[in-house]
């Protein structure tokens, strides 16, 4: 079957929609009348003929069919007239056939715009067949009727403001257009004459001067100017209903291509920006529900969207928290650091910059092809590094060589070495502002000022190795809590100042207190364990200790008393965490289990009874609220993030649990099944180390991302990371090193040698394409 041809003018033959129809009449206006008159008289025509049907008129449809068929004659533009029937007389009005509309007059003599095809009106039109035009035209302008002489040759009339509604003058054409000749260009002169090109000096005043400009042969009018004036005249003098009718006629006579262009233009400009049309608070709330990928895309949608997003403090705060770059409780601290780092930026800009930096770095962490910049620094004299702290851009390590070494994580260099202990350093805790506390096998606790590079206080009192320590703060007082192999915990107040003047006598410091009685910072001793205290954790006034006697004890350091004894493990306890937000205690043991204890409501645990110790009555709880199983060997390591509780064991496995309900979330195994010696976790990343293995996991996808970054290390002793920087204490070829990995930079590895007894560092940089070559230490 053949396809139907598409109409060239799709809207021409459709009925006028109801909302665009008009009824009744309108009073004649000078400017509109001038436009109608000019439209009729401006067309060049040598003759005019009345074509009539049996009733003396020709149907417009027949005329259009003839024009479409074509007669082979050259038909120049002509004046077309519509015959309007009245009871008493017939009046001819100029019309424009190209707009398929005409001016009609009702019984009151008022002009009315109607649709010719709908009203079955008849036309009196000029034809170019050489017949004579009527000698007289009766033109009805308003109520009055005027007779206009129509000679065989007619010149365009010059119409003044007073002539529009009262009379129409005719003139003689001196140079009539020859039949078949092309129409004159708007800028061309009449034959035999020369007309200089000059801009018109006439001023259009919304009356028949518009027609005067149209008819003018000696002036050049800007098309835009003329269009604006015509539109203004129509818009100011036509009622809205008639104006809509006229617009529809204009659109109806556009061809398919023009309609398509117009439709696209209308569609594009009718689009509505929902976000900017809403109140700012509601728009912001909508953005708060978007993920960061959508937020980044929204920044490029429009300037308004970009402004809303960029200037919103709450939005960037929400993104930082929701993407796990900062915890809700840590936001204020982050905001303070950012204000110090970017003092000239607004809060919104600081938060936005921080978020974008974190996103960029996280993508590098998650990219298995990304190789971070690696810097290797000389470690301790022994191969084993026992403890590591990474705070305030300080990386601090302790070892059995009795030394504490401090590195700068920003500049990736060794800073200084702290000496003073007479035994191995097994416990470290960074306080604030460069203050460090250490515990040693020499049974002492030392307080250090890193900025001044010296020890400020020495606390004595333990009878055996200080194996663990923590710092808690309660009512603006910071307490040092230490656990020892002598089965006790000691509590000291942390000195508020280093007490070392800038130019003091060095031999007077550190301040050494040989006995607790003479120590003004000593608070007391906590007794209750029957074996070595292996782990301690606390917050505020609550401290939890775990011992080789298989029990945990919950202490109140403000009152220096025991609160609860937690029994349930069947073997030594190696790690414990006090979850102060949920008021729970978490412990890991050699019995391969992890146990959860509810300290807010002790009746949620096992059987509860009361026991007494040397100080005060103490509740004894037999059995935990939850017991987590899955490991098959000693569980020696625990860490808690906002989302996950993570445990690591000697069976080479790492398991993740939901921090709220303790459901299983993930499980990883090192390929060599060697004991996990260290790991560190955030809500986005997990890093673990063991013998000959160092892994980085994407906790969002659950996939192993990196496994070969430190493949030249024989043993990973300790790891920690924050932001773009990961630090790892490792052993290679019987020596210890500190590795610094920068995930904001790629592919460059620095191998650095530091003289052990010097705070200055000699640097040697070697770059490799993959960063996997073994370290060569420069002597």
UniProtKB/Swiss-Prot annotation:
The keyword Repeat applies. The gene is CDC4. One of its GO terms (cellular component) is nuclear SCF ubiquitin ligase complex. SMART domains: FBOX, WD40. Interacts with DCD53 and SKP1. Component of the SCF(CDC4) complex containing CDC53, SKP1, RBX1 and CDC4. CDC34. Interacts with CDC6 and CIC1. Interacts with SIC1; the interaction involves a SIC1 double phosphorylated motif (degron). Homodimerizes; the dimerization increases SIC1 ubiquitination in vitro. WD repeats lie at residues 380-408, 420-449, 461-493, 528-556, 568-598, 630-658, 669-698. A motif (Nuclear localization signal) lies at residues 82-85. This is Cell division control protein 4.
């Amino acid at each position: 079957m053949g396809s139907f041809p598409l109409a060239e003018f799709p809207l021409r033959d459709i009925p006028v929609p109801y909302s665009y129809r008009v009824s009744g009449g309108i009073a004649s206006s000078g400017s509109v009348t001038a436009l109608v008159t000019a439209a009729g008289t401006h067309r060049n025509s040598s003759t005019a003929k009345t074509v009539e049907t049996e009733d003396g008129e020709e149907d417009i449809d027949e005329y259009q069919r003839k024009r479409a068929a074509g007669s082979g004659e050259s038909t120049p533009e002509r004046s077309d007239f519509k015959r309007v029937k009245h009871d008493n007389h017939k009046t001819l009005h100029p019309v424009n056939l190209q707009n398929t509309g005409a001016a009609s007059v009702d019984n009151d003599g008022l002009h009315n715009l109607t649709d010719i095809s709908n009203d079955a009106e008849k036309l009196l039109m000029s034809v170019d067949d050489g017949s004579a035009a009527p000698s007289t035209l009766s033109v009805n302008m308003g109520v009055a009727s005027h007779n206009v002489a129509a000679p065989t040759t007619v010149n365009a009339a010059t119409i003044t403001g007073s002539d529009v509604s009262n009379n129409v003058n005719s003139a003689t054409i001196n140079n009539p257009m020859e039949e078949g000749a092309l129409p004159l260009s708007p800028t061309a002169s009449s034959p035999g004459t020369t007309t200089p090109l000059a801009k018109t000096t006439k001023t259009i005043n919304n009356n028949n001067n518009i027609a005067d400009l149209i008819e003018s042969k000696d002036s050049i009018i800007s098309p835009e100017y003329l269009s604006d004036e015509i539109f203004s005249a129509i818009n100011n003098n036509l009622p809205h209903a008639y104006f809509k009718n006229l617009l529809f006629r204009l659109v109806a006579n556009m061809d398919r291509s023009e309609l398509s262009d117009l439709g696209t233009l209308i569609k594009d400009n009718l689009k509505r920006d929902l976000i900017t049309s809403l109140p700012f608070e509601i728009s912001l709330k909508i953005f708060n529900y978007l993920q960061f990928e959508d937020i980044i895309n929204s920044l490029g949608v429009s300037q308004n969207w970009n402004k809303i997003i960029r200037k919103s403090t709450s939005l960037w705060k929400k993104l930082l928290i929701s993407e796990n770059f900062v915890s809700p409780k840590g936001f204020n601290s982050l905001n303070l650091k950012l204000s110090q780092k970017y003092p000239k930026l607004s809060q919104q800009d600081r938060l936005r910059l921080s978020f974008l930096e974190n996103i960029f770095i996280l993508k590098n962490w998650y990219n298995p092809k990304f190789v971070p910049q690696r810097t290797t620094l000389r470690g301790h004299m022994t191969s084993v590094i026992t403890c590591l702290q990474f705070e305030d851009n300080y990386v601090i390590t302790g070892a059995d060589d009795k030394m504490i070494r401090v590195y700068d994580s920003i500049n990736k260099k060794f800073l200084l070495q702290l000496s003073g202990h007479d035994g191995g350093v097994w416990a470290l805790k960074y306080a604030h502002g460069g203050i460090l506390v250490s515990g040693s096998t020499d049974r002492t606790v030392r307080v250090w000022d890193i900025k001044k590079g010296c020890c400020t206080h020495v606390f004595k009192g333990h009878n055996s190795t200080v194996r663990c320590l923590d710092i808690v703060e309660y009512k603006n007082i910071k307490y040092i809590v230490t656990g020892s192999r002598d089965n006790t915990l000691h509590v000291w107040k942390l000195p508020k100042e280093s007490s070392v003047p800038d130019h003091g006598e060095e031999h007077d410091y550190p301040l050494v207190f040989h006995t607790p009685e003479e120590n003004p910072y000593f608070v007391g001793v906590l007794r209750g364990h029957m074996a070595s205290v292996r782990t301690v954790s606390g917050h505020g006034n609550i401290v939890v200790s775990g011992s080789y006697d298989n029990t945990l004890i919950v202490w109140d350091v403000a009152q220096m008393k025991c609160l609860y004894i937690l029994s349930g493990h069947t073997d030594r306890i190696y790690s414990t965490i006090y979850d102060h937000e949920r008021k729970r205690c978490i412990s890991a043991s050699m019995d391969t289990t992890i146990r959860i204890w509810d300290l807010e409501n002790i009746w949620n645990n096992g059987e509860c009874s009361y026991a007494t110790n040397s100080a005060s009555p103490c509740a004894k709880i037999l059995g935990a609220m939850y017991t987590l199983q899955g490991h098959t060997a000693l569980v020696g390591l625990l860490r808690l993030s906002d989302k996950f509780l993570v445990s690591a064991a000697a069976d080479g496995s790492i398991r993740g649990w939901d921090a709220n309900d303790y459901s299983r979330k993930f499980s990883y195994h090192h390929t060599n099944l060697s004991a996990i010696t260290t790991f560190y976790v955030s809500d986005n990343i997990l890093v673990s180390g063991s013998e000959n293995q160092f892994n980085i996991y994407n906790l969002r996808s659950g996939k192993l991302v990196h496994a070969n970054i430190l493949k030249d290390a024989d043993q990973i002793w300790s790891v920690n990371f924050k932001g773009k920087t990961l630090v790892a204490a490792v052993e290679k070829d019987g020596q210890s090193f500190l590795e610094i990995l920068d995930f904001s930079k790629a592919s460059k590895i620095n191998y650095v040698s530091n003289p052990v007894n010097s705070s200055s560092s000699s640097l040697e940089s070697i770059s490799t394409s993959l960063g996997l070559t073994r370290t060569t230490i420069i002597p």
